[in-house]
Amino acid sequence: MELHNIRDEYTKRVLSQHDCHKNPISQFEQWQKEAIHAQVNEPTAMNIATVDEQGRPNSRMVLLKEVNEQGFVFFTNYLSRKGGCIERNPYVALTFFWPELERQVRIEGKAVKIPAEQSDKYFATRPYTSRIGAWASEQSAVISNYKSLLAKAALVAAKHPLNVPRPDYWGGYLVVPETVEFWQGRPSRLHDRIRYRKESDNWIRERLSP
């Protein structure tokens, strides 16, 4: 299947280094708000790439649940494949892609577990069925069929008809950024790329060649 002729010309916006915030978190928050306002499909969806013990990368989509001055928070099963990779090598890469705005954000940094109390607080806000699912799913494990998963979920629901506690193996990670790159599509593939990199306690802001 040849895909050579599928291409778009990017013309919607410009990213000026002069107009960027001094802090990448503030710049990200601005872009995140604009993505939500533009009704981008799944504006909080991000790809997270990890590396296993053999140095092989793997990636998957997760949802960003919080941005704060420390970094980017997502939640998952700590016993999943991604959790195992992070346990052995905490350095990860995140990518957001908002095609409606012709924008991409790339983040590299270290993932650390957030305090259990914070995971408890978020878990309590999840829909009941999602909390049941956290107990029923042995994430990344091979299962015989879908019916067995539903049966396990039913057993969990019978045990916890009202309040569902958070499993110890489920919680949040904070990705503490070391580099953050903002990409804005431009005509003729001469895209805008502004990178922030951490040096000591300061952020260095620089333009990259496309």
Curated annotation (Swiss-Prot):
PROSITE patterns: PYRIDOX_OXIDASE (PS01064). Disulfide bonds: none annotated. InterPro entries: Pyridox_Oxase, Pyridox_Oxase_CS, Pyridox_Oxase_N, Pyridoxamine_oxidase_dimer_C, Split_barrel_FMN-bd. It catalyses: pyridoxamine 5'-phosphate + O2 + H2O = pyridoxal 5'-phosphate + H2O2 + NH4(+); pyridoxine 5'-phosphate + O2 = pyridoxal 5'-phosphate + H2O2. GO terms for molecular function: FMN binding; pyridoxamine phosphate oxidase activity. GO terms for biological process: pyridoxine biosynthetic process. Pfam families: PNP_phzG_C (PF10590), PNPOx_N (PF01243). FMN binds at residues 60-65, 75-76, 81-82, 104, 139-140, 183, 193. Pathway: Cofactor metabolism; pyridoxal 5'-phosphate salvage; pyridoxal 5'-phosphate from pyridoxamine 5'-phosphate: step 1/1; Cofactor metabolism; pyridoxal 5'-phosphate salvage; pyridoxal 5'-phosphate from pyridoxine 5'-phosphate: step 1/1. It comes from the Bacteria. Binds 1 FMN per subunit. Its cofactor is FMN. The keyword Zinc-finger does not apply. Its EC number is 1.4.3.5. Substrate binds at R7, D8, E9, Y10, K65, Y122, R126, S130, R189, L190, H191. Keywords: Flavoprotein, FMN, Oxidoreductase, Pyridoxine biosynthesis. Belongs to the pyridoxamine 5'-phosphate oxidase family. Catalyzes the oxidation of either pyridoxine 5'-phosphate (PNP) or pyridoxamine 5'-phosphate (PMP) into pyridoxal 5'-phosphate (PLP). Homodimer. This is Pyridoxine/pyridoxamine 5'-phosphate oxidase. The gene is pdxH.
